[in-house]
Amino acid sequence: MKASMFLALAGLVLLFVVGYASESEEKEFPRELLSKIFALDDFKGEERGCKGFGDSCTPGKNECCPNYACSSKHKWCKVYLGK
């Protein structure tokens, strides 16, 4: 019973996201949706002077915020795990 309720709720959420995506014509839809859901606007790199998760960066320069490192392979800031 709990599993069917969870699946029904997950289906409704998925239907909402797909419906919203089909109406949206902006190219930055995924980031916009995450911004609205998790209020990521407070964490944009322009406001804090350093680059956050997923922002493009140049390896060797210390552009990423603390706890993030510039990936030399992908050239974007990712979580630094200390390895």
Curated annotation (Swiss-Prot):
Expression by tissue: Expressed by the venom gland.
InterPro entries: Huwentoxin-1, Huwentoxin_CS1
Cell compartment(s), UniProt: Secreted
Chief location: secreted
Cellular compartments per GO CC: extracellular region; host cell presynaptic membrane
Domain of life of the source: Eukaryota
Keywords: Amidation, Disulfide bond, Ion channel impairing toxin, Knottin, Neurotoxin, Presynaptic neurotoxin, Secreted, Signal, Toxin, Voltage-gated sodium channel impairing toxin
Binding partners and assembly: Monomer.
Protein name (Swiss-Prot/TrEMBL): Hainantoxin-III
Species the sequence originates in: Cyriopagopus hainanus
